[in-house]
Regions:
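N-terminal export/targeting leaders of redox proteins
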Residues: 1-24, 107
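Electrostatic cytochrome c docking/interface patches
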Residues: 15-30, 45, 56
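The canonical Cys-X-X-Cys-His
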Residues: 33-41, 98
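Generic structural signal for secondary-structure transition and capping sites
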Residues: 35, 75-77, 107
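Protein kinase-like catalytic domain
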Residues: 39, 72, 103-106
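Axial heme c-ligation environment in periplasmic c-type cytochrome domains
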Residues: 46-57, 72-99
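Short microdomains enriched in Cys/His and/or Lys/Arg
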Residues: 56-66
Length: 107
């Protein structure tokens, strides 16, 4: 039983499910990097609402990695005609924090 518990805990950690996102830090990152000029939690502004992003990618095991790519390098055509600009000045850790946080915002 102990082995099963350890295995389950290890799988949860490896999958990222047990990884808690620091919401306050993520919101501060979003504010400081201009994300909230185009996005909000529940309403479309210029870009999609974070809840819509969550809904679109919720079943994608690579969602966080995809979002990291879009935040770092920008993207075109995923959410309409207006492209998302790249954010090359953000650290990889900050980008990952934002991507993980976005995936916690449910409709």
């Amino acid at each position: 039983m102990r082995t099963l518990s350890l295995l389950t805990a290890g799988l949860l950690l490896a999958s990222g499910v047990a990884h808690a996102v620091d919401e306050a830090a993520a919101i501060e990152l979003a504010k400081n990097n201009g994300c909230l000029s185009c996005h909000s939690a529940k309403e479309k502004i210029v870009g999609p609402a974070y809840s819509a992003v969550h809904e679109k990618y919720k079943d994608d095991k690579d969602a966080v990695a995809s979002l990291v790519q879009s935040i770092q390098y920008g993207s075109k055509g995923k959410w309409g005609r207006i492209p998302m600009p790249p954010h090359p000045g953000m650290s990889p850790a900050d980008i990952k924090t934002l991507a993980e946080w976005v995936m916690t915002i449910k409709p």
